[in-house]
Structures are given as structure tokens and as C-alpha cells.
């Protein structure tokens, strides 16, 4: 499959996000170039198709420099560090800051031909999280919401179908789908899911719920609609979640101290650890955001902190998933709004570069 990825023609970021979403939904991977794949005997049921049951989407907010990470160059554009040899034969080399990922690069595939039409952060984020360009009157669903729409909730799982970690309440959410398909926002992985415990004793809590249901019942009978039903379903699912043993998946304190240290104590590291715990408990789609990639100034200094952190955490996540037998069923995707210019600017940084 890595060979096929390397052979495919240029694709846009929007096309890539649609293919990624389809993969998460159990639809055939990479329909672009499908004729070529069929000619070589690859299809559903053969290696490379249909294994993913979960997605961890690592979004690098700000426009990650591709040259210093996944698509290194030589000469004056390479930056402060020389490219390093990647493990295996399909990738070649990685940016000099990617020492840990180079050791596990035989487990990843790179698409180095993506392009975009926008160099604006907001539009780029929207495309990379929905697969659509922004339109004034429409809010499109996030990829996690699409997964819920097409696949439904995973049977027997009380946890939300999708979560977004380190984002607060920002993001497209359910879009034009019902509220029940909205990803649950986790602003701080150390804190986990907030406001989930009743503020009163159980008897008083149940009395309030019964009273609320009594008030709502006449409204539901008078205004029968999908929107009202979706709101009721959302409330019911929340009640189940509040009583579920699966809530412990949000509690990072249950992880061994050495595992938490290995991921790193920053929010991206702990966010990736939380994502692993959540998919382990049945969550289908977990997005983890990491900001700080808008490196217009002193890109080399910024990469010495941001880049090395991302490298260490990403490699730890891959190894951890593999050790727990989750890597085969989990698609881990990294994306960003756009790349950054090959030329270093007057402030020793790199500017927006949507053609990569």
C-alpha cells in the first residue's frame, strides 16, 4: 500500500480528507487511482483495505513546516538540520528533528503530493477537519460526526463516538447532523470530561430528572420532529454515560507513571495518551490538536521545542498502539492547514505555503 501511495497523482487536501473519512467509515481506501489498484489485483478483502475500526487524528494547528518534518529538502531550503534516514525503503528520509519517528517509519505511509487553494488559517482548518471549503450558509460535519452518521454508535459502548482533545468548544461539531453526533470537546486531557458528576445526591438528582421529563413529555407530543427526538436521545445518552464504568477511560491517573512520562507531561502528549485510552474503550474517532506551528519567526528555534515534542509523542503513540495490539485496527493520521515556504524569510522563519 505504501508503494501505491507513492505512485498516486497529486491530490488536494479536500480529496485527502474525504478519503480519510471514508477509510474511517469502512469504505474502500483511496478510490483515486482505483483503476490502477484493481489492475494489480488489490481490492476489498485483500491486504490494505478495511482493517481500521478507529481513527486518531493529530491536527497540527498553525501550518506545520513540511520541509523540517515529513518532506525534507537539501541545500539552502533544508534549515538548520540535515535530513535523516528513515527506517525501511519506502520513505527515504525525514527532517532532522524527527529522530524518533525515523525509528518507527516502517509503520507509516507519507503522502507528499497534497496541495490546497487556501493559505488562510481558518479556511485551512475547516477543510482539514470537514473535507469541505467553507460556505457562508452551511456548517459541515466534522469527520467524527460523519462516522457516527454512516456507521451509528458502536454497539455496547456508552462513551461518545467521537472526541476532540485540546480544542475547547472550537470546531465544526455535528454540522447539519443532529446534536447527538457532536464530538465531545476535552479542553484539558489532565482534567478529562468535566461536569459529569451530579452536584446533588442521587435521590435529588433522580427527582430533578423525573420532573424535567414530565415537563418535556407534553412538548415532545405536541412537537414531534427529528430535532426534538435527537435532543431527547442526546439527553438519554448523557444519563447513561454519567452512570457508566467506562468513564474511567477519561482518567489519566489510572495510567502507570512511567507511561505518562514516556508520552510527556505536556498537553499534546497527555492528549495522545487519552486518545489511546478512549479508542481502547471503544471510541471510534479521537482528534488531538497541537498548536504553535505558525512559525513565521525563527523556525529552527521553534522546531527545537515544538518539532522534537511532536516527534517524541507521535513515535510513542505508534509504539504504544502496537504493543497493545491496537495499531492494526487504528488509523493514525496527521494533518495541518498547509505547509510552509521553502525559502527562509527575513525573520528566519517560514511563511504560509498552501501548494504543499
Residue ranges, per PLM feature:
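Ligand-binding pockets and gating/stacking loops
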Residues: 2-356
Amino acid at each position: 500500500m505504501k508503494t501505491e501511495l507513492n505512485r498516486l497523482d497529486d491530490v488536494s487536501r479536500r480529496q485527502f480528507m474525504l478519503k480519510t473519512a471514508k477509510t474511517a467509515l469502512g469504505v474502500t481506501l483511496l478510490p483515486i487511482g482505483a483503476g490502477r489498484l484493481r489492475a494489480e489485483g488489490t481490492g476489498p478483502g485483500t491486504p490494505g483495505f478495511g482493517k481500521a475500526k478507529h481513527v486518531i487524528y493529530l491536527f497540527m494547528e498553525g501550518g506545520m513546516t513540511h520541509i523540517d518534518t515529513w518532506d525534507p529538502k537539501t541545500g539552502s531550503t533544508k534549515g538548520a538540520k540535515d535530513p535523516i534516514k528513515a527506517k525501511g525503503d519506502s520513505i527515504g528520509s525525514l527532517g532532522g528533528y524527527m529522530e524518533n519517528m525515523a525509528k518507527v517509519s516502517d509503520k507509516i505511509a507519507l503522502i507528499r503530493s497534497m496541495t490546497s487553494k487556501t493559505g488562510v488559517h481558518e479556511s485551512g482548518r475547516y477543510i482539514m477537519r470537514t473535507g469541505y471549503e467553507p460556505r457562508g450558509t452551511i456548517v459541515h460535519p466534522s469527520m467524527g460526526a460523519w462516522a457516527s452518521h454512516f456507521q451509528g454508535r458502536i454497539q455496547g459502548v456508552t462513551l461518545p463516538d467521537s472526541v476532540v482533545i485540546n480544542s475547547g468548544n472550537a470546531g465544526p461539531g455535528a454540522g447539519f447532523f443532529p446534536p447527538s453526533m457532536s464530538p465531545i470537546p476535552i479542553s484539558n486531557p489532565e482534567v478529562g470530561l468535566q461536569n459529569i458528576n451530579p452536584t446533588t445526591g442521587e435521590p435529588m438528582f433522580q427527582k430533578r430528572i423525573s420532573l424535567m421529563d414530565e415537563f418535556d413529555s407534553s412538548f415532545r407530543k405536541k412537537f414531534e420532529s427529528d430535532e426534538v427526538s435527537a435532543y431527547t436521545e442526546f439527553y438519554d445518552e448523557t444519563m447513561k454515560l454519567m452512570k457508566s464504568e467506562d468513564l474511567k477511560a477519561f482518567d489519566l491517573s489510572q495510567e502507570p507513571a512511567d507511561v505518562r512520562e514516556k508520552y510527556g507531561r505536556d498537553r499534546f502528549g497527555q492528549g495522545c495518551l487519552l486518545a489511546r485510552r478512549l479508542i481502547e474503550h471503544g471510541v471510534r474517532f479521537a482528534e488531538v490538536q497541537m498548536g504553535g506551528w505558525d512559525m513565521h519567526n525563527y523556525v529552527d528555534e521553534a522546531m527545537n521545542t515544538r518539532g522534537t515534542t511532536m516527534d517524541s509523542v507521535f513515535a510513542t503513540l505508534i509504539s504504544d498502539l502496537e504493543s497493545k495490539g491496537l495499531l492494526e485496527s487504528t488509523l493514525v493520521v496527521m494533518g495541518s492547514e498547509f505547509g510552509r515556504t521553502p525559502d527562509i524569510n527575513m525573520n528566519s522563519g517560514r511563511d504560509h505555503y498552501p501548494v504543499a
